[in-house]
Amino acid sequence: MSRIGYKTIVIPEGVTVTRDEDVITVKGPKGELSETFSPDVAMNVNGNEINFEPTGKYDNKMCALHGTQRANLANMIEGVEKGFNKTLKLVGVGYRTQLKGSDLILNVGYSNPVDVKVPEDIDVKVPDNTTIEIAGINKQHVGDFAAKVREIRSPEPYKGKGIRYENEHITLREGKTGK
């Protein structure tokens, strides 16, 4: 049984949710998101509240689908109302970044700078040369882009150098000891 799937979603003021067959569209002050949802889970709108009810046999697949669709819609509503942010820090001597147009240029210890194309639905800011702020209304796109940038030079366990999330803790390991 999906505990998340049965939770009620409250629609805040300024946000509208419309359903056209299998496509749910959410509009808010920050933008608009649309996603295709499975018809196996019924969406019931009562005033400013939304509930999801499974239709048909409630097996493991339906349980997962029920909770996932509810979480996806809640994330869409939060995204168009407040947006999502991720902050990355560059840790290491000489590691720096800059933004040129829609390209993020990273100098992270390789022989050449690494260019990363910023998707259109994501806003990237570089307040200083060791910080990257990623913002957008789609939680999955923001997280995927942040993971893609972090993957270029993920933190290593001996000195902690690399690209890390702002509040990420890296457990440092001890190096080899001589005889």
UniProtKB/Swiss-Prot annotation:
GO MF annotations, alphabetized: rRNA binding; structural constituent of ribosome
Database matches in InterPro entries: Ribosomal_uL6-like, Ribosomal_uL6-like_a/b-dom_sf, Ribosomal_uL6_a/b-dom, Ribosomal_uL6_bac-type, Ribosomal_uL6_CS
The organism's place on the tree of life at top rank: Bacteria
Q: Name one Pfam family in it.
A: Ribosomal_L6
What keywords tag this UniProt record? Ribonucleoprotein, Ribosomal protein, RNA-binding, rRNA-binding
- What are the record's GO terms for cellular component? cytosolic large ribosomal subunit
Q: Which Gene3D superfamilies match?
A: Ribosomal protein L6, alpha-beta domain
Q: What induces this one?
A: Expression is induced 2 fold by treatment at 45 MPa for 30 minutes.
Task: Read off the SUPFAM superfamilies from this record.
Answer: Ribosomal protein L6 (SSF56053)
The Gene Ontology biological process terms listed for this entry are:
cytoplasmic translation
Q: Which family does it belong to?
A: Belongs to the universal ribosomal protein uL6 family.
User: Subunit structure of this entry?
Assistant: Part of the 50S ribosomal subunit.
Q: What does this protein do?
A: This protein binds to the 23S rRNA, and is important in its secondary structure. It is located near the subunit interface in the base of the L7/L12 stalk, and near the tRNA binding site of the peptidyltransferase center.
Q: What is this protein called?
A: Large ribosomal subunit protein uL6
Species of origin reads Fructilactobacillus sanfranciscensis
